[in-house]
């Protein structure tokens, strides 16, 4: 029997869909048994978190970005702990060991998530916030709404000034959902390998990043975040932070292909009190590839 090219394409798509259905693992109690740290229950589900460092140290909360959960802070945590800080890390919904609620992943969700984490863990004293990529947008908006407990704000390659539109998968709900479900693993593998080759992200970090693609709910969370968070304009939030005299450090990689090169300039135009640091030769994976420069800049800023 001869099959037309169209039928062969449909057959391959069907096989890919079946494969995706049967290879994604649920994030359940069995999977969480291997997790370091602990869990808390908030309104939308379980959140995986970890405390690091001395109990009485000044607190800094690290908020990760779009695709890589809290293990992205592998190279920042030791430096902060050695400097005496009490470090809190956690996984956003849909990533790491946290739950996968079927909710729109917009700023409202992420702000509620962070707010409930701090309240549930009973963090009553002031703290610093550090956000990377999408996490930079989350902490910017969060701080503009809740200034009272936040001392200083560190942004690493933050969103908030992206122009244009998301890709077709984010714009077309049904087709995009299906494409992300079927081909998301391939897309992530290609992106991770590209980062390893172009930026020098090490193989251990790449392996951890690709492990995320094996879990159910991960791709839908990422796609929803692209649709509803990544392209959010943060200029008004930054204006509020300037009015309130919030101390801000913003770090950018000079070779970042994800966050546009003019972002530092745009941020400075809105808030000329923000300190800007540009790291030569660094791409979007700078927290891993240029951790020494990142850590030095963070600690210098926090100690001022």
Where are the language model's segments positioned?
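Flexible "cap/lid" loop of the alpha/beta hydrolase fold
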Residues: 144, 151-181
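Alpha/beta-hydrolase fold catalytic core
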Residues: 1-58, 82-85, 235, 303-304
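Active-site loop/oxyanion-hole signature of alpha/beta-hydrolase fold enzymes
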Residues: 43, 50, 82, 89-130, ...
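Catalytic histidine-centered segment of alpha/beta-hydrolase-like enzymes
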Residues: 282-291, 295
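Short beta-strand/loop motif that positions the catalytic acidic residue
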Residues: 244, 250-252, 256
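Acidic catalytic loop of the alpha/beta-hydrolase fold
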Residues: 255-259, 284-285
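Conserved HGGG/HGGXW glycine-rich cap/lid loop of the alpha/beta-hydrolase fold
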Residues: 52-97
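Conserved alpha/beta-hydrolase catalytic His-Asp/Glu region
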Residues: 28, 166, 181-244
